[in-house]
């Protein structure tokens, strides 16, 4: 198969950490052609989705992990699979790229279908913070708002809260709110851009000191997990914010959460997803570019990326003759 990965600049990807690299390596091990492009390479040409594409040779255990063998301009329908793994934030350029990806199978008459994951319309519609609110029985007390007084009222009710930007990643812009903090008003002003930008405010969960659990789901089923434990001087467990990763297992509550959200994820076209769980609560659903595969491999002695690529092959085998 020809698998096109739409990613950040290749030179910024880190082998041993970036899930996109692990997936490319697994695809190459399985004998598939690995292509790469950036969001800026996508375009519509003669009414067809197309891109400037790099054909890669993947080098396991080497830096850089790839060689660009060729650069060519192709209709995106030339790929058998397109994997959209551009990191957030979801900018206007990102949204435009999903519109281009909607056109991949438009007007083709060859009986084939290129599989695009996650589904472009789902990437547009399902904000990674707000998506979890479709499951009100699973999430902690939450308010999404812009006004300072609404946030202060929430803090008064719950004692402490966490404020998050709706378009952040890797723990960026996340702060702990407490009435006793003399910086409280300044944090709210900065987070909301003086009341002009919506934020999410959630009840602070004491269990977050023990870590937040990243659970990776493939086609709605959990295939691995890790625990991200924050530093003593931080409330964020994200790896990008200095959190450490710890081996973990799924509790019955974790499995219940997966059973509830899994069918909805698949229905919305989200086949590869990372959900975040703190204690008994779902806090986030990561659909754009979920990570954690490399760390789970090391912690659990597995090779999840091989399992994922094998699933992809089996799932898309009939896709050449059916409409996904």
Swiss-Prot record:
GO terms for cellular component: cytoplasm. It catalyses: gamma-L-glutamyl-L-cysteine + glycine + ATP = glutathione + ADP + phosphate + H(+). PROSITE patterns: ATP_GRASP (PS50975). Pathway: Sulfur metabolism; glutathione biosynthesis; glutathione from L-cysteine and L-glutamate: step 2/2. ATP binds at residues 155-211. Its cofactor is Mg(2+); Mn(2+). GO terms for molecular function: ATP binding; glutathione synthase activity; metal ion binding. Mg(2+) binds at residues 284, 286. Its EC number is 6.3.2.3. Gene3D superfamilies: 3.40.50.20, ATP-grasp fold, A domain, ATP-grasp fold, B domain. Residues 129-313 form the ATP-grasp domain. Binds 1 Mg(2+) or Mn(2+) ion per subunit. Keywords: ATP-binding, Glutathione biosynthesis, Ligase, Magnesium, Manganese, Metal-binding, Nucleotide-binding. It is an enzyme of class 6 (ligase). The keyword Manganese applies. Pfam families: GSH-S_ATP, GSH-S_N. The keyword ATP-binding applies. Belongs to the prokaryotic GSH synthase family. This is Glutathione synthetase. It comes from Gloeobacter violaceus (strain ATCC 29082 / PCC 7421).
């Amino acid at each position: 198969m020809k698998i096109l990965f739409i990613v950040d600049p290749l030179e910024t990807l880190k082998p041993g950490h970036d899930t996109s690299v692990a997936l490319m390596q697994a695809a190459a091990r399985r004998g598939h052609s690995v292509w790469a492009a950036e969001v800026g390479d996508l375009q519509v040409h003669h009414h067809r989705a197309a891109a400037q594409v790099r054909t890669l040779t993947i080098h396991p255990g080497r830096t850089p992990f790839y060689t660009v063998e060729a650069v060519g301009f192709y209709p995106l329908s030339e790929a058998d699979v397109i994997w959209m793994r551009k990191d957030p934030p979801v900018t206007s350029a990102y949204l435009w790229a999903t519109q281009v990806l909607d056109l991949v199978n438009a007007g083709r008459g060859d009986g084939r279908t290129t599989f695009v994951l996650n589904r472009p319309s789902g990437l547009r519609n399902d904000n990674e913070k707000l998506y979890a609110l479709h499951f009100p029985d699973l999430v902690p007390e939450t308010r999404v708002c812009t006004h300072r007084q609404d946030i202060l009222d929430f803090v008064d009710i719950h004692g402490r809260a966490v404020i998050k930007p709706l378009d952040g990643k890797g723990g960026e812009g996340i702060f702990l709110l407490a009435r006793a903090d003399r910086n409280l008003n300044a944090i709210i002003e900065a987070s909301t851009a003086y009341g002009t930008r919506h934020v999410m405010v959630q009840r602070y969960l004491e269990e977050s000191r023990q870590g937040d659990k990243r659970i990776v789901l493939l086609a709605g089923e959990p295939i691995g997990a890790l625990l991200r434990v924050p530093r003593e001087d931080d409330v964020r467990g994200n790896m990008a914010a200095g959190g450490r990763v710890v081996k973990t297992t799924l509790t019955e509550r974790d499995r219940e959460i997966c059973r509830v959200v899994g069918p909805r994820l698949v229905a919305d076209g989200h086949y590869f997803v990372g959900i975040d769980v703190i204690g008994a609560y779902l806090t986030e659903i990561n659909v754009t570019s979920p990570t954690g595969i490399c760390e789970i491999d090391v912690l659990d002695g597995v090779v999840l990326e091989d399992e994922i690529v094998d699933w992809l092959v089996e799932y898309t085998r009939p896709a050449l003759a059916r409409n996904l």
